[in-house]
Amino acid sequence: MKKLILLVVGVSLFAIPSPAQSVDASVSYSYFRLGGSSAVNQNGVSGSLAFNHLWFGIAGDFGVYHATPSGVSLNTYTFLFGPRLTLRNPTHINPFVQGLAGGSRLSAGYGGTSAASNQFAFAFGGGVDIGLLPHIALRPQVDYVGLHNAGQTVNCTRVSLGLVLHL
């Protein structure tokens, strides 16, 4: 009986939330440059959700980007996950870096025909959260995004600007 009580108390202590834990949710306008020298410029929206403990967090990052080069409707979707390291300081300017991996989907349509492909995706980059209000920050961010399919990698750049809600 004594062991059962100690077990219940021990498990209960792990369930108590720590004040250092937080959640960040962001929504941003994103400029996505798909490819290298003959690249396609896409505009879209990206969002992320990060679960943080002090300086370390796990982030999920999702994006939708669109362009219509030469009448072809081109859409890129990204869904990435990975670690985010944040330097938290009292000046309300918190830089971060992240390394993410996941997948992407490219789809193109023209004149009633369409095609799509899925590929492995990864991203490395960072940004800075600039505090505006107690729980709201402005987030400029730049990432290198690689889309890997059939032994080739398409090099992409994503530049974003949005708002973050710190919960």
Residues of each region from the PLM?
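Transmembrane beta-strand segments of Gram-negative outer membrane beta-barrel proteins
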Residues: 21-33, 95-99
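A short acidic/glycine-rich loop-to-helix N-cap element
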Residues: 40, 149-154
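Low-complexity, intrinsically disordered Gly/Pro/Thr-rich segments
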Residues: 142-149
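Gram-negative (and chloroplast) outer-membrane scaffold detector with strong preference
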Residues: 47-113, 119-125, 130-132, 136-140, ...
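Extracytoplasmic loops and strand-loop junctions of Gram-negative outer membrane beta-barrel proteins
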Residues: 30-33, 108-110, 146
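Surface-exposed strand-loop-strand hairpins of Gram-negative outer-membrane beta-barrel proteins
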Residues: 32-47, 117-119
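Cleavable N-terminal export/targeting peptides
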Residues: 1-22
